[in-house]
A protein has these predicted regions:
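Conserved alpha/beta-hydrolase catalytic His-Asp/Glu region
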Residues: 138, 153-208
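Acidic catalytic loop of the alpha/beta-hydrolase fold
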Residues: 219-224, 248-249
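Short beta-strand/loop motif that positions the catalytic acidic residue
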Residues: 209, 215-217
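Conserved HGGG/HGGXW glycine-rich cap/lid loop of the alpha/beta-hydrolase fold
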Residues: 19-69
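Flexible "cap/lid" loop of the alpha/beta hydrolase fold
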Residues: 113, 117, 126-155
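Active-site loop/oxyanion-hole signature of alpha/beta-hydrolase fold enzymes
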Residues: 62-103
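Alpha/beta-hydrolase fold catalytic core
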Residues: 1-32, 52-56, 89-97, 133, ...
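Catalytic histidine-centered segment of alpha/beta-hydrolase-like enzymes
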Residues: 246-259
Length: 270
């Protein structure tokens, strides 16, 4: 009850577990990696080595994941609550006056977009890798999007059957994450799916964003709706879109674009 009062009613941000992946003597910027659903900070180990430049690089465990808190109150894993926790992490680094770049994958990209809406003066650019951005309710959905949303609702409402389905999908290589051994382990993932992905308003957020944004997605990604992303690129000139030959997980070509764009942005700031 106290946890709910403190973090829900008083809106005190949660303290996320964060891993410092690189420390530079004279960092030109701070880069924060934000993982996707059912993952954790460790997923960025290879990506960190592919970022070129003198940066301090961090990776966080989002609420409900890894070593971060796993609260049970409704809404604890919403995008706004996650973004507040990322802001706390940025402040505690004591280097938030440096240029800040957020790199999010999948659900983490939705958190990065929410952060840019809530704290536009804190972030210089966001990179959204494989973002599952879905249409507003009043918009006309594609068949793929309709099926995805129905599948997500099924996972949330029927945990017994859905854990089998998800583990089968993981076994087929749809996502590079560990299989779930129990409902206790699976519960935070279902909460994230409901509160962050199903209940998102990221399309509306990005359609109005003033934060420089780069979206990179795979041509063969089964959970990303390419036409939604391309539409955002058309209606907002702050958003640049790139499609690569990949599925859902981050690839070397994605991280290479991130690295080049960060260094380009820093040169343009001089």
């Amino acid at each position: 009850m106290f946890d709910s009062f403190l973090h829900k009613n008083m809106r005190v941000p949660y303290r996320l577990h964060a891993k410092k992946m690189r420390s530079s003597e004279n960092p030109k910027a701070v880069v924060v990696f934000i993982h996707g659903i059912a993952s954790n900070a460790a997923m960025w180990k290879k990506a960190e080595s592919e970022i070129e430049g003198e940066f301090d690089i961090y990776a966080v465990d989002l609420i409900g994941h890894g070593k971060s808190p796993k609260p049970k109150w409704l809404g604890a894993q919403s995008l706004a609550v996650q973004a507040r926790a990322v802001r706390r992490m940025v402040f505690t680094m004591k280097k938030y006056k440096k240029p800040l770049f957020l790199v999010g994958h999948s659900m983490g990209s939705l958190v990065a977009a929410e952060f840019s809406k809530m704290y536009p003066n804190l972030v210089d650019k966001i990179f959204l890798l494989s973002p599952p951005i879905y249409s507003p309710e009043e918009a006309r959905e594609s068949v793929q999007e309709f099926i995805l949303k129905k599948s997500y609702q099924k996972i949330v409402s029927d945990p017994k059957e859905s854990i089998k389905f998800v583990n089968t999908a993981i076994g087929m290589g749809v996502a590079d994450v560990e299989k779930f051994d129990s409902q206790e382990q699976f519960r935070p993932v279902r909460r994230s799916l409901k509160e962050a992905i199903i209940q998102q308003d990221t399309f509306a957020v990005l359609s109005k964003t003033e934060t420089p944004t780069k979206i990179i997605y795979g041509a063969f990604d089964p959970v990303v709706i390419g036409r939604n992303i391309r539409k955002l690129g058309r209606i907002n000139d702050k958003i640049k879109v790139s499609r690569v030959l990949s599925a859902h997980d981050p690839t070397k070509s994605m991280i290479s674009q991130v690295s080049k764009d960060i260094n380009k942005a820093l040169k343009e700031q001089k």
